[in-house]
Amino acid sequence: MTYLLDVNILIPLLDSSHIHHTAAFGWFSAIGGKDWASCPLTENGLLRIMSNPRYPNWAGKPVEIAALFNYMRQMTEHRFWGDEISLLDPGIFDIEEIRKPGAITDVYLLGLARFKNGKLATFDRRINANAVIGGHEALHVIDT
């Protein structure tokens, strides 16, 4: 099983001072690190948040965060999933189930994981899996 790592998993994996570092690292070491994926949205989110000087554990400019993440991407267990789907595809998404604009990215990531026959690994318990056809099977919520 390939796990698409949500931004809320990637950040604590790279930030050892993050409140969820132990949970993320423990799960990744035991389960997720055996076969995992990133995509343009998760990589962009990681760079955007961790390179923001207002981030509590600011680690540097985007180029520095990218270098740190590239180390992880070079793992043989890593897969890169390109953006190959659309929220407008009724074979993947039930757009009527997306009730808030803030949910769009999470639903898209869940749909991408489902499309790739993987799972979205996240700490977020609020993702509406009904917005993705077969979404419940593709959602893997990690305990904090």
Q: Where do the model's predicted regions map?
A:
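A generic structural signal for well-ordered alpha-helical segments
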Residues: 31, 72-73, 113, 131
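Acidic, PIN/NYN-like endoribonuclease modules and their adjacent C-terminal/linker elements
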Residues: 85-99, 110-144
